[in-house]
Amino acid sequence: MQRGFEELADTLGKLVDRPDEVALVVAVGLASAVQRRQRGVAYHSDRGTGTVAARTMRRADGRIEVIIESGFLTEVDAYGQGRFTPAGQPQLSRRGLAQMRKTIIHEAQHATMHQRNSGYDQFEVGGHAGDYPRWDYAVAAKILDEYRAEWNAAQHDSRRPPSVNDVLDVLGHLGSELAAADARYQAEPDPAAVATVMEGVYNACAAYWTWMAYWVAQFRGNQILVGAEIQNLNLWKRYVGSTWEGLIQILDEVPIEDLGAPEAKLRQAVARVAHHWVPQSLHQTGFRHVVTTGGEAFYIDDHDFPSERS
């Protein structure tokens, strides 16, 4: 296992500007490690169709920690139990190490953006929250952050465009989560339940939007956007539709080759995603979230949330 950790640390160090300011942290549990560093903020590593393997965080002193989940590196048997070496040490999963290396390459881009003062923290999410429906600016900043990191990661390592199964996994899970949120609200449709259903919808969409950012990054600069086999999927038509082209139009204009891109251009792009694309995507999935003179209003416009793989 030690050799695997050293390989990952070496990969990380080669991809950031100032390796001495970046530490690789191997955590027994990613969620608890993040929460210890971010007191009072809920964090769950279960995300969409899987589990988050890593998180990059800037410390108060300016140093950066890339935290990874150690369980991804352990070989397991058919029953999900960890395998051990004759010496009683956890057995390293070579497949897990290869996948974690891809994750490290992605997280290194986040670390570099932090070092060049152009990462998520620089978007001043809190200062812009009042200009948009709750969470829209924050999720827009997240979309842009993940898009830039994934595109640059692809320059260091091969990234394949999404397959039909990849898309069905993500959109099927999205449909299930939206249906569950709607069902909880319909079972008890009182004013207090509005905040709950809104949170459930945003949580479901956040994982989906992250995948959209990855996919757009993988297709950047290509004339062929997605194949007909994906565009013709019922779930794609239902949840994505024209929002795919809309997100591409915005993100294609974002300067990404330099991870220290001008702050003004990045904030302009975030504002466009928050103002135009997030509401468009919510509407496509069946919801509206608007700011009125009396406050915020959240509407459910569709109660059909398919999840069947078709």
Give a label for each model feature:
Residues 28-30, 70-72, 109, 117:
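Short, flexible loop/turn elements at secondary-structure junctions
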Residues 104-113:
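Active-site His/Glu-centered metal-binding helix of metallohydrolases
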Residues 31-46:
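Extended, Lys/Arg-enriched charged tracts that mediate electrostatic binding to polyanionic substrates
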Residues 42-101, 114, 308-310:
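Active-site scaffold of zinc-dependent metalloenzymes
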Residues 170-310:
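Pan-zinc metallopeptidase signature
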Residues 1-26:
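Zn2+-dependent metallopeptidase catalytic core
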Residues 151-180:
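Short helix/loop segments within enzyme catalytic domains
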Residues 94-99, 114-146:
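Post-HEXXH active-site segment of zinc metalloproteases
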